[in-house]
Design a protein with these regions (language model features):
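Cell-envelope/extracellular polymer assembly enzymes that use nucleotide-activated donors
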Residues: 3-5, 36, 181
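Short, acidic, metal-binding catalytic loop of nucleotide-sugar glycosyltransferases
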Residues: 22-34
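A conserved acidic beta->alpha catalytic loop
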Residues: 23, 40-49, 69, 96
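Acidic donor-binding/catalytic loop of UDP-sugar-dependent glycosyltransferases
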Residues: 46, 94-108
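Long helical/loop segments within the catalytic core of UDP-sugar-dependent glycosyltransferases
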Residues: 65, 72-75, 106-167, 213, ...
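Glycine-rich, basic loop-to-helix element that forms the pyrophosphate-binding segment
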Residues: 67-84, 181
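Short aromatic/hydrophobic "clamp" motif used to bind/position activated sugar donors
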Residues: 89
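Catalytic donor/gating beta->alpha subdomain of glycosyltransferases that bind UDP-sugars
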Residues: 110, 116-138, 172-240
Length: 262
């Protein structure tokens, strides 16, 4: 039976941390051995007390690594990976809701040749214009992921990675596009990266135009940061695939496409 570590980086997630922990513990884990849940936390809100109370009420092994000052996502990922004892590490953002079979789907695709399995993030349905923009972008991303391996394959909301491979990777402090960095590293080591459309993880879409814009800007800044660091990105998305899938998704979600321009 494969041993698995769940890792959750968190920062001020008092409204979400209990939900993600319950989602993980009560999910379909019949064919895997969940040896531990590691939370790397920089919170200044009530997240620590909520986690500690949760630990008292549940028998699963939970390791809570708390920092009194904010050290960032890269430090959290490094902490989780270096402390993991499972053969496979499954990383979840603290504000997502994995479907019951998501962990199992992420674990099942890892083997001797596959180093990373990317999840299939899906925004929760919402009728707001910013949310519809998020939904359209996500539909386009899912569409291109199904067509080819690219810089958009691995998204940080949820992924699985072989522990022995992950422990050879040190994520630079302050890095934004951690998911793309890790994908490139794994490909550079000669392992495959796969996308599993059945590994569904739900997330809340942007509620305001400011939130939507900040998400887009952060993604752009993350890619530009890697360029400035002169880090080589493998498997660029082809222009043909990008355009074909854009028009394909627009045909079925024209309002969503329009929402990205408002």
């Amino acid at each position: 039976m494969t041993t698995v570590t769940i890792g959750i980086p968190s920062y001020n997630e008092e409204l979400n941390i209990k939900t993600i922990l319950e989602s993980v513990i009560f999910s379909d884990l019949n064919s895997i051995d969940l040896v531990e849940i590691i939370i790397s936390d920089d919170s200044t809100d009530d997240t620590p007390s909520i986690v500690k109370q949760f630990m008292e009420n549940h028998s699963k092994k939970i390791i809570f690594l708390h920092n009194d000052m904010r050290k960032g996502a890269a430090n959290a990922w490094n902490n989780i990976i270096q402390n993991a004892t499972g053969e496979i590490v499954v990383l979840y953002d603290a504000d997502v809701m994995p479907e019951p079979n998501c962990t199992l789907e992420l674990v099942d695709k890892i083997n001797n040749n596959v180093g990373i399995c990317a999840s299939n993030p899906k925004p929760i349905a919402d009728r707001g214009i910013p949310a519809r923009g998020t939904i359209f972008v996500n539909e386009w991303l899912e569409s291109v992921r199904e067509k080819e391996l690219s810089e958009y394959t691995v998204m940080g909301r949820a992924l699985s990675i072989r522990s022995d491979i992950a422990k050879k990777i040190i994520i630079p402090e302050g890095l934004i596009a951690i998911d793309l960095f890790i994908q490139s590293k794994v490909l550079g080591m000669g392992y495959d990266v796969v996308f599993n459309p059945n590994a569904i993880v739900l997330f809340k879409p942007a509620k305001t135009f400011v939130d939507f814009s900040s998400q887009v800007i952060r993604a752009i800044n993350g890619h530009n940061q890697l360029k400035k660091l002169r880090y080589k990105k493998n498997n660029h998305l082809s222009i043909k695939t990008a355009l074909v899938e854009f028009f394909r998704v627009t045909m079925r979600n024209a309002f969503g496409a329009l929402s990205t321009c408002l």
